[in-house]
């Protein structure tokens, strides 16, 4: 077993060194500064991730903050985080020493460790929580935070262990639970109180890049336009299928709708339109439970079962119906009409056709303001040599490059070498062309 570990570490180090050299070479040929290109987050720099200290046996300790230089940093406890993403998540919390509660560790064992330290916060992944831990935190006035993947995550799925470029950290609630306030909801409510022309300009620049390069949360699928469908002069209305027992629906929708319910409502409300139904890929692939069979509505809609690029799909329709899917907001970015039956973070602000009341959401922000709150102010980004000091522009550029065939390590290295304010559609396009012209 020891030899296997040594070989794995050696392989990781060789990949890291190769990626770093590739980034340095590309930056030099592109005429970009290369001083920070010795760090690559797509392949994390090899580190001792098996740190252990007396009294901390209940925890997996990850991150450079556990080294001597960070020994005075406060400690946060993280619950429900899979081992494969612990290293990269620690980079998002560089101001803390991150202690991950090991799987199947009893709360009693965790609590006995508190004689060694007082946690700065308890951090839960999504809605995963240990009741005893939550009660202890409330009783002891320890802040409760929740984390989830950000809205511009990666090229590839988390289920495939693709590491995230962004993380939503919520110190109040979580964005997909409308039953209570969240940090995101507060940001949206307050963003228009003080005019910030620079922030709005950034929002517009970022939305233009997202649209130009067809970016979405996961950026999976081939660039397949809808020209393969039968020609039609009718309006096209897209129904976005979701995993029907997903937390965003269970918590975000007061009524209980199936995907087929939404298809039938869409057809009834748009009898003259061509209704296009995209079932969720995880349901089609048998990875998540199917509650409604798409074949039952095949007579009233066109069902997409292919590997369609979501950006191309949204560009090809006029109107989107969904329960709570983020694809609804991605449609708003592309100036499409959106109808929602639940209460996702972007509903209730006057920008969508809402079928569920959201009484706390009384402001009427512009789309630019809503985007700025949700994509610029709310998430944390972690890209290349910048680590958690990266901005949304770095993530957008990295995703655009990788989606167009640039290896992730190179995409992150090049993107993180540029100042955020210099990144726009032309910059990304020119960099992409430059990278394609570099001999391999």
Curated annotation (Swiss-Prot):
<keyword id="KW-0963">Cytoplasm</keyword>
<keyword id="KW-0614">Plasmid</keyword>
<dbReference type="InterPro" id="IPR007833">
    <property type="entry name" value="Capsule_polysaccharide_synth"/>
</dbReference>
<dbReference type="GO" id="GO:0015774">
    <property type="term" value="P:polysaccharide transport"/>
</dbReference>
<comment type="function">
    <text>Involved in the invasion of nitrogen fixation nodules. May be involved in the biosynthesis of lipopolysaccharides as an enzyme or a regulatory protein.</text>
</comment>
<dbReference type="GO" id="GO:0005737">
    <property type="term" value="C:cytoplasm"/>
</dbReference>
<dbReference type="Pfam" id="PF05159">
    <property type="entry name" value="Capsule_synth"/>
</dbReference>
<protein>
    <recommendedName>
        <fullName>Lipopolysaccharide-processing protein LpsZ</fullName>
    </recommendedName>
</protein>
<dbReference type="GO" id="GO:0000271">
    <property type="term" value="P:polysaccharide biosynthetic process"/>
</dbReference>
<comment type="similarity">
    <text>To E.coli capsule polysaccharide export protein KpsC.</text>
</comment>
């Amino acid at each position: 077993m020891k030899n296997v570990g040594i070989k794995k570490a050696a392989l990781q180090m060789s990949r890291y060194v190769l990626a770093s050299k590739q980034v340095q070479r590309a930056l030099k040929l592109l005429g970009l500064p290369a001083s920070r290109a010795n760090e690559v987050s797509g392949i994390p720099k090899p580190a001792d991730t098996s740190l252990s200290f007396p009294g901390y046996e209940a925890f997996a300790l990850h991150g450079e903050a556990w080294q001597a230089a960070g020994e005075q940093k406060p400690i946060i406890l993280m619950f429900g985080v899979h081992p494969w993403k612990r290293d990269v998540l620690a980079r998002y919390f560089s101001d803390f020493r991150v202690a991950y509660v090991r799987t199947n560790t009893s709360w009693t064992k965790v609590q006995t460790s508190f004689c060694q330290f007082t946690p700065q916060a308890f951090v839960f992944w999504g809605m995963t929580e240990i009741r005893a831990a939550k009660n202890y935190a409330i009783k002891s006035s320890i802040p409760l935070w929740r984390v989830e993947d950000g809205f511009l995550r990666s090229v590839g799925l988390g289920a495939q262990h693709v590491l995230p470029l962004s993380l939503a950290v919520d110190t109040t609630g979580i964005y997909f639970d409308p039953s209570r306030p969240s940090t995101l909801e507060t940001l949206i409510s307050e963003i228009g109180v003080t005019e910030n022309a620079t922030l709005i300009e950034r929002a517009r620049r970022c939305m233009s890049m997202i649209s130009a390069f067809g970016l979405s949360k996961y950026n999976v699928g081939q660039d397949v336009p809808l020209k393969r469908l039968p020609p039609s002069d009718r309006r096209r209305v897209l129904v976005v299928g979701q995993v029907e027992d997903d937390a965003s629906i269970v918590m975000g929708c007061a009524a209980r709708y199936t995907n087929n319910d939404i298809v039938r409502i869409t057809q009834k409300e748009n009898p003259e339109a061509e209704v296009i139904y995209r079932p969720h890929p995880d349901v089609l692939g048998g990875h998540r439970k199917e509650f409604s069979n798409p074949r039952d509505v095949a007579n009233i809609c066109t069902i997409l079962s292919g590997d369609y690029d979501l950006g191309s799909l949204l560009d090809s329709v006029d109107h989107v119906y969904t329960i709570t899917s983020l694809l609804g907001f991605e449609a708003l970015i592309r100036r499409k009409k959106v109808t929602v039956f639940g209460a996702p973070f972007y509903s209730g602000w006057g920008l969508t056709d809402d079928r569920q009341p959201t009484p706390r959401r009384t402001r009427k922000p512009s789309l630019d303001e809503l985007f700025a709150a949700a994509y610029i102010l709310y998430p944390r980004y972690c890209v290349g040599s910048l680590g958690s000091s990266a901005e949304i522009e770095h993530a957008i550029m990295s995703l655009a490059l990788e989606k167009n065939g640039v290896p992730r390590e190179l995409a992150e290295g090049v993107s993180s070498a540029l100042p955020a304010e210099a990144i726009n559609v032309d910059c990304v396009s020119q960099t992409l062309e430059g990278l394609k012209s570099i001999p391999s």
